[in-house]
Amino acid sequence: MRCRTVLGGALALLAWLAIPAAAQQPDRWTIPIHTHTLDNGLTVVVSEDRSSPTVGVSVVYHVGMRLEPENRTGFAHLFEHLMFQGTPVAPKGTFDRVIQGGGGILNGSTRPDYTNYIETAPVSALRPILWLEADRMKTLDFSETNLKNQQDVVKEEIRNNVQNQPYGGFMWIDIGMQAFQKWENNHDGYGSFKDLEGATLADVEGFHRDYYGPNNAVIGIVGDIAPAEAFAMVEEYFGAIPARPTPPRRSSRSTA
């Protein structure tokens, strides 16, 4: 009995001593993060992951539904659509052909405080992805045809996802309108048809100029690439894009 007691005590002591040692072991789930800021203000975040020969890219702009003008509800989301309509150098459809044609995927989404554009593809596609993202950061194909087309697309999206979902769906639209008093938080980010139809090319050009500069963006790269190599690529494609003034942020984010 005494032998068992001593043995049990010894095992307990070993277990207790092992706790600090285990705590000192590196966390195998720690994700390596490297950051760098270009001279034009673009923030670059890179995480090397050699588990597969792929890469994920996310370009995030610090503008979302909260910053759209009061008479232009839904404009941030509409503008996200226009970012896929091509540029003078890379016409509409180029993004899809280059990325999806090489086995990758792409998408975009609009949130209250940011809008992001993502691509996942073989690592060999990283240079084309960065070139395309830099190209549409510089300018877009500002045309009445593209604007009218995407106004109709967004209105159809509203019909399908909001108006024809009487028993559920996008509850966050109703919650925001009921929970908050300030317009920035309680308006419908999808927008009204009247506001969407009222958007002009001048609105589009101004929004791109004010919010889609490198100093208002973060680009994240995760995948089969060394941080130094990724930083060099971003510098190559984005470094010459000049920083642009951004409108002052509203003084308060209070929702009271």
Predicted regions and their residues:
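Feature targets compositionally biased, intrinsically disordered low-complexity regions
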Residues: 7-8, 40, 103, 190, ...
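His/Glu-rich zincin catalytic helix
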Residues: 21-96, 118-121, 127-134, 205-256
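Short hydrophobic "helix-edge" motifs at membrane interfaces and signal-peptide entry regions
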Residues: 9, 66-68, 191
